[in-house]
UniProtKB/Swiss-Prot annotation:
GO terms for MF: deoxyribonuclease V activity; magnesium ion binding; RNA endonuclease activity, producing 5'-phosphomonoesters; single-stranded RNA binding
Broad class of where this protein is predominantly found: cytoplasm
Enzyme Commission number(s) from the entry: 3.1.21.7
Source species of the chain: Pyrococcus furiosus (strain ATCC 43587 / DSM 3638 / JCM 8422 / Vc1)
Subcellular location: Cytoplasm
UniProt catalytic activity: Endonucleolytic cleavage at apurinic or apyrimidinic sites to products with a 5'-phosphate
EC supergroup of this enzyme: hydrolase
Key words, A-Z: Cytoplasm, DNA damage, DNA repair, Endonuclease, Hydrolase, Magnesium, Metal-binding, Nuclease
The name this protein goes by in its record: Endonuclease V
Domain of life: Archaea
Pfam families given in the database record: Endonuclease_5
Stored CDD domains: Endonuclease_V (cd06559)
Amino acid sequence: MIDLRKLTEVQRRLSRKIVEKPIDIAKVKRVGAVDVSYKNNFAKAAFVCVEFPSGEIIKTKTIVTTVEFPYIPTFFFLRETKPILLAVKDENFDVLLVEGHGKAHPRRYGLASHIGVILSKPTIGVAKRLLRGVSKDTYVKVGKAFVSVGNLITLNDAVRIVEKLLDENGYPKPLNIADKLSKRGESREKE
């Protein structure tokens, strides 16, 4: 049996590890993006790395692993951490876009924050919808995306990076590519 009260307390404690600080956007050369899809008891994570600010694809990679945690709203970080960490392992990027929330979360600690805290790298939460109970000061809507701080970045810098990577549909191009790759049949790496 999963104890949601304990998990809630763990999440609140972990949220204190988030650091918001400005980054030098002129030094950002590679932006990674990661998304996960599910089929049966398997998770498929896709990683895409693009040049910044051009958005030109440098690398794509997908991995498949077993699912170890059920889907529980607002505890997504427990389900997606393993596949995401496997997908970004040994990859070189300056900032990571995560399909999911960062501080735009009822406990101010979503998936993007968790990944950023674990990796000690700048992460940005990018989501298509808001969760209930989210404070308006934790996100900015950019195109069709709700952008929030994951870790080691300010909301202003996160917005500036996402704005430069929007596609014609108003969503960050690297995340759209990662989404499509995560839903394709086979797993592979391409440079």
